[in-house]
A protein has these predicted regions:
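Conserved metal-phosphate-binding beta-hairpin within the catalytic cores
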Residues: 1-21
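Domain-scale recognition of functional cores that engage charged ligands
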Residues: 6-8, 23-27, 34-269
């Protein structure tokens, strides 16, 4: 899980929840390097995060995921899957993850979704049975043709997929932020007034864009940020102040949420 926070003068604001956030492996390496050479950085680092603690915790997490999905026996082979993995900006992290997991006794491969095959025995990569897929794809529902083999393997329970479409829909679909910023919905969950206030203070107001409210959002567009409900990163996301009518006509057709604009914090370098 990853939480995208913008730090403001009034505290952090939750912009997105991600189920396939990257960077943990690389950040652990960076933190370890900094503690070795730069003592001044130590107070700024998260307590207890070092290679000695991070590595076994991560390996244990994969093992726990394996057993949480009712698998018997030992987890043996893990596939790290993404589109054209060697071309991804975070490919170095895939290599770091592979090395870490191999050191804990797992066989690990890095593959694209089109490299996978499905057989009665399970999901295969070059004839090797895959037990668990560490899913780095941004095709969250596995709807694209390239992802169909992985989708079928997941739906037929022939592989453990983490994260998977169910987990993304449950936690990371941006429409969930509409609920988390709705005081009536929060009250219906049985939260106290204090708990409700904490959440409302932390989550910028978010709403689904549809034809009924499109005109109002257009008139107030400078106060909002628009992004696909099932998108990722900055892809097809727009700051309202910079919207053109052509782009707005596409947003107004649906599939987008509007979030109260919260600028990211900046730092002088």
């Amino acid at each position: 899980m990853g939480y995208d926070l913008h730090v403001t003068g009034n505290g952090p604001r939750l912009i997105e929840i991600n189920t396939n956030a990257g960077g943990a492996f690389l950040n652990a390496l960076l933190a370890d390097a900094q503690t070795q050479c730069c003592r001044e950085t130590r107070p700024a680092l998260v307590a207890g995060i070092s290679q000695d603690t991070f590595r076994p915790r991560i390996a244990r997490m994969f093992e726990e995921e394996w057993h949480a999905q009712d698998r018997a026996g030992e987890l043996e082979c893990i596939a790290i899957v993404d589109d054209e993995p060697e071309e991804q900006p975070l490919f170095p992290e895939f290599l770091a993850a592979r090395t870490l997991l191999q050191e804990h006794g797992y066989e690990v491969v890095i593959a694209g979704p089109e490299d996978l095959e499905l057989s009665p025995a399970g999901l295969l990569f070059e004839a090797r049975k895959i037990d668990l897929v560490y899913n780095r794809l941004v095709d969250f529902s596995l709807d694209r043709p390239e992802s169909r083999t992985l989708q079928e393997a997941y739906l037929s329970d022939r592989v453990v997929l983490s994260p998977n479409p169910h987990i993304h829909a449950l936690y990371a679909d941006k429409r969930n932020l509409c609920l988390l910023s709705d005081p009536d919905w929060l009250a219906s969950c049985g939260l106290s007034e204090r708990e409700t206030k904490v959440i409302l203070d932390a989550v910028p107001k978010t709403a689904i864009v549809d034809r009924e409210n499109a005109e109002q959002f257009w008139s107030e567009r400078r106060d909002w940020f628009f992004k696909p409900a099932r998108g990722y990163g900055s892809k097809a996301a727009y700051r309202g102040a910079k919207l053109t009518k052509r782009v707005w006509s596409e947003i107004a057709e649906g599939g987008y949420v509007a979030q109260r604009f919260t600028p990211p914090s900046t730092r002088k370098v």
